[in-house]
Amino acid sequence: MPLLPYALTRPFLFGLDAEAAHELIIDLLARGQRTPLQWAWCNQTVDDPIELAGLRFPNRVGLAAGLDKNARCIDALGAMGFGFVEAGTVTPQAQPGNPRPRMFRLPEARALINRLGFNNAGLQAFVHNLQQSRLRAAGSALRLGLNIGKNASTPMAQASSDYLACLEGVYPHADYVALNISSPNTQNLRTLQGDAALDHLLGAIAERRATLAARHGRRVPVFVKIAPDLDEAQLSLMAATLQRHGIDGVIATNTTIDRAVVQGQRHAQESGGLSGAPVLQASNQVIGQLRAALGKGFPIIGVGGIMSAEDAVSKIRAGADLVQIYTGLIYEGPALVVQAARAIKAMGGCGPVIALPNRS
């Protein structure tokens, strides 16, 4: 368990502006990783190996994209007990994102609203940081997902060019690549979830992936991250499109633009994506509908509203194969990672993924 109980540090962090606290933590993790300071947040990884999309994961609990946008803290995050970490979202060129303030806590709801807008240092810096990871260089069992998007200045008609540029850049470093087409904080980005736009984008991705697989001698799985604000008909069309283009999995879900559950709370009317406890039910519903549309064997990573071990289990029962945490980490601390992984392991064969025997 972590040597520094999160309950002691959370009041200090919550006394800061939400984004300032985020930046402080990222900076501390980046500076402290690979030093004795890392013991302050180190957890033992729960040994619950599974295989999905041709990849072996140490356990089913991962970190969602958005926390480590520039891949600065992979080694530190890997020490928290995650089975996989997803870094990004990265865009081809560096961009500042939307004006501040742009991240807000809703403590009563155990939620966050953000409208960051893919603020990141760009693809070149992202790849440089990936190359500095000792875990990656040492062949760690930790799986690494790299989440890619488009620059705000790129016209939607040319969006595929940004995704292709990022795919090309991150491909040698990724265990899987995630296409973020569902952030509500880049204007019109969610139109890429429409049938025709998605068909065009995924066709281009599939073609480029085939070229890269031949060049690098390995086929990197591609996942698509979707919104919770889609109806069943939209999900059915999307499922068919994903399968038609040989996409390897779906990440369900991103943040929501719906505010019904948090009406009346401070910051509830701020624009942006809502994450945390209020998203759990909607996310689980989308997971269930996707599982029905995609069938038993199609990989689903469930994310949205995991604030406890029981919430993580609910994602698996809804139809997810793996789960990801982000806002829960902010409210509950690193101990949630191990708690969730242990609870899922205790399910035994109840989840949709077959557990593999431990390797000595």
UniProtKB/Swiss-Prot annotation:
Substrate binds at residues 69, 114-118, 180, 185, 254-255. PROSITE patterns: DHODEHASE_1 (PS00911), DHODEHASE_2 (PS00912). One of its GO terms (cellular component) is cytoplasm. Its EC number is 1.3.5.2. GO terms for biological process: 'de novo' pyrimidine nucleobase biosynthetic process; 'de novo' UMP biosynthetic process. It comes from the Bacteria. InterPro entries: Aldolase_TIM, DHO_dehydrogenase, Dihydroorotate_DH_2, Dihydroorotate_DH_cat, Dihydroorotate_DH_CS. GO terms for molecular function: dihydroorotate dehydrogenase (quinone) activity. Its cofactor is FMN. The active site is at residue 183. It catalyses: (S)-dihydroorotate + a quinone = orotate + a quinol. FMN binds at residues 65-69, 89, 147, 180, 225, 253, 276, 305, 326-327. It is a peripheral membrane protein. It is found in: Cell membrane. Catalyzes the conversion of dihydroorotate to orotate with quinone as electron acceptor. HAMAP family: DHO_dh_type2. Belongs to the dihydroorotate dehydrogenase family. Type 2 subfamily. This is Dihydroorotate dehydrogenase (quinone). It comes from Verminephrobacter eiseniae (strain EF01-2).
